Amino acid sequence: MIQYHKGRDKNMYTKAELLNLYNMDLDALLNESKKYLKDEVEFCSIINARNGKCSQNCKYCAQSSHYNTEIESYPLMEVNEVLEAARDSQKNGADRVAIVTSGKTPDESDFDTMLDMIKTLNKEGIKSCASIGILNENQAKKLAETGLVRFHHNINTCRSYHPEICTTHTYEDRINTAKLVKKYGMELCCGVIIGMGESIEQRIEMALELAEINPDSIPVNILTPIPNTPFADYGDKIDEENILRTLAIFKIACPEASIRIAGG
């Protein structure tokens, strides 16, 4: 097993070390990751509060206006609609409820409505989360002041592979949003999508970049290929064994974070 370098943080691995772990016997790797697991499971739920017509060209996404995915698009839901959906989620066992919207970043009017949604959920005693795109400093500050508990914003992939995924915003845009969330004291949920054609080495890069960001929660989405997107035929880019290896590596690299398994 890997020996830690003297004088460094015990959780900071090198790329070579994580790659060695990734390629070891699967049972041994899973046993190593179990050292960091808690005997508990969390459930979260999302409310798709605005759907479709996104200006960004993320190659995996059904909501991008760049691809003819034939999804139903609708504008931002009303506050009372979100509240009813959140109550249903809570009754069904969700530990927290996230307001999720399509689009790069909300305009001022929609953002004010989102703040009202968060206030309403907080009054109801529902743990609030939001996934509303790339933030500026003023938006991050207002979300924190409103009492948002957690903000979700994925890095989606590693820095070296980002240009293969999206060209309408930068990797740094995503990193800056994560930094703003932490700056204003909110919990950060920040993860990736795997199975998009990235290499094993690039999955290791994802783990290291997430370890640097230090989120509270890491959703690991396994790509669900969407017809008529550029990744429509990517259903065979990762198998079950490599999914398990990736999950184990993420837990080893980020032992304090909750690892969430998702489809995306």
Q: Model-derived features: where do they sit?
A:
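Short, Lys/Arg-enriched N-terminal segments with co-localized hydrophobic residues
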Residues: M1-N11
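Canonical Radical SAM [4Fe-4S] cluster-binding loop centered on the CxxxCxxC motif
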Residues: R8, F43-E81
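An N-cap/entry alpha-helix motif that binds or orients negatively charged groups
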Residues: T14-C44
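Conserved, mostly hydrophobic/aromatic
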Residues: D25, C58, I99, H153, ...
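Core AdoMet radical
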Residues: H66-A85, S89-A178, M186-G191, D216-N221
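Glycine-rich phosphate-binding "P-loop"
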Residues: T101-K104, T229-D239
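Conserved C-terminal portion of the radical SAM core fold
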Residues: K123-G125, R150, E172-P230, L244-R260
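Active-site-adjacent loop and "lid" segments of alpha/beta metabolic enzymes
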Residues: D236-I238, S258-G264
